[in-house]
Amino acid sequence: MKIIYAFLLIAVVAFMGSGIMAEPLTDKPGQAKKIRIFDRIPELINWMIVNH
């Protein structure tokens, strides 16, 4: 269980970090797709944990 919690913690930190880093880029219209990819990272990690 500790491993799962570690993955979730990393996912949350990565999600928050990518959100902070992506904020200045929202002024450019081409950056929206990259931000959506960052938003999907925690979902992918959770999917990998559930289906492993």
Swiss-Prot record:
Q: Where, by tissue, is this protein expressed? A: Expressed by the venom gland.
Please give the residues making up the propeptide in this record: 23-24
Which keywords label this protein?
Neurotoxin, Secreted, Signal, Toxin
User: Which source organism?
Assistant: Pogonomyrmex rugosus
Q: Which GO CC annotations does the UniProt entry carry?
A: extracellular region
Q: State the protein's name.
A: Myrmicitoxin(1)-Pr6a
Instruction: Tell me the protein family, please.
Output: Belongs to the formicidae venom clade 4 family.
Q: Which GO terms describe its molecular function?
A: toxin activity
Where in the cell is the protein located?
Answer: Secreted
Record function comment: Probable neurotoxin.
Q: Where is the signal peptide?
A: 1-22
